[in-house]
Amino acid sequence: MPNFKGTVKWFNPTKGYGFIKPAGSDKDVFVHISAVERAGLSTLNENQTVEYDLVENRGKTSAENLKVS
């Protein structure tokens, strides 16, 4: 079950990435198209509410295990 909740700030499916604005935080979270596709989605919409986990890879944090809420 995802640990964090936030709102999609923007997502560009052509570029393959975007950012989520976490609830209660000003530090945006990177989200890659591969995480979106693993969630069975083709894109994320601006202002869409999502739940997610934070995963660190190569010193960078990103959203994984997305769930539209």
Show where each model-derived region lies.
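Beta-strand/loop nucleic-acid-binding surfaces
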Residues: 28-39
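OB-fold/S1-family single-stranded nucleic acid-binding modules
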Residues: 56-69
